[in-house]
Amino acid sequence: MSEYRVNHEPVFMLASSPWRESSLWVEAFSRRYGRVALLARSARKRQSELRGVLVPFVPVSVSWYGSQELKTLHRAEWVGGWRQPQGRALFGGLYVNELVLKLTAREDPVPELYDALAEVMEAVCCKAAYIDDLRRFEWRLLNLLGVAPDLNRDGDGGTIAAGGTYLVRPETAVFPVGKGFAVPPHAAGVVAPGQSLIDLREGSFRTAESLQQALKITRLFIRHLLPEGLKSRQVLEQIRQFDRKETARETVPTSDGTASNAV
């Protein structure tokens, strides 16, 4: 295969790791070429122009060459965008990057996924409330991967009804069930109201219940695809557990027998 060059391609940096003495191995998701592996030579040197450019969560314009799976990056430019995520939002960005990194194949172009990635990254970095955006992104990703069930019609051919109740499972259609139906122990599935499925399909979460059901459904499918779990989610859960322990430790009884926070 002859060597080819790509110039000024918009990408998002998904992950990077040291390569030999001073270089970086970068995994990036591009709009026209999908996920690509890039070797950024000398990028870890102090004088490298790439040090402040190869950052996650914001769009970057890059140029590369090479015919092998690992391309050589020879130029990168920050194209403007938004600030880096702060606080807990950082884990939202890491979570999105890990999903794309683990669920996409190299050099499989999906322009719609790049657009979805740009939208959710802007939301995570710029909005105080971005949970809706995460659920929308997860569902779009599952649809683009071809693993999301049809939420227009159920497995019997009927239209999803707002007042109905449905069983959602991986690798099969959505089926109507009675309101008292429960998923058997150790079985993978979510019982959800029809309105919640409609809201998930439309990406418009009208109630807290719809948003909670969306979380259950997207988590069900992601666990099915990635049974080993996600590091970003595990780290965030550890932080939450630490916060709960600290809150419990700092809560002391007052003289009237009630509890108050000591700090």
UniProtKB/Swiss-Prot annotation:
According to the UniProt entry, which residue ranges have a biased composition of type Polar residues?
252-263
Please indicate if the UniProt record lists Zinc as a keyword.
no
A Pfam family hit: RecO_N
A single GO BP term for this record reads: DNA recombination
Is Methyltransferase found in the keyword set? Answer: no
Region ranges (Disordered): 243-263
> What domain of life does the native source organism fall in?
Bacteria
Query: What's an example GO cellular component term for this entry?
Result: bacterial nucleoid
- InterPro entries attached here? ARFGAP/RecO, DNA_rep/recomb_RecO_N, NA-bd_OB-fold, RecO, RecO_C
Keywords attached to this Swiss-Prot or TrEMBL record, sorted alphabetically, are:
DNA damage, DNA recombination, DNA repair
Similarity section: Belongs to the RecO family.
Tell me which PANTHER family the record gives: DNA REPAIR PROTEIN RECO (PTHR33991:SF1)
Record-linked HAMAP family: RecO (MF_00201)
Role: Involved in DNA repair and RecF pathway recombination. Involved in pilin antigenic variation.
- Protein name listed in UniProt: DNA repair protein RecO
Per the UniProt record, the source organism is: Neisseria meningitidis serogroup B (strain ATCC BAA-335 / MC58)
Q: Which gene encodes it?
A: recO
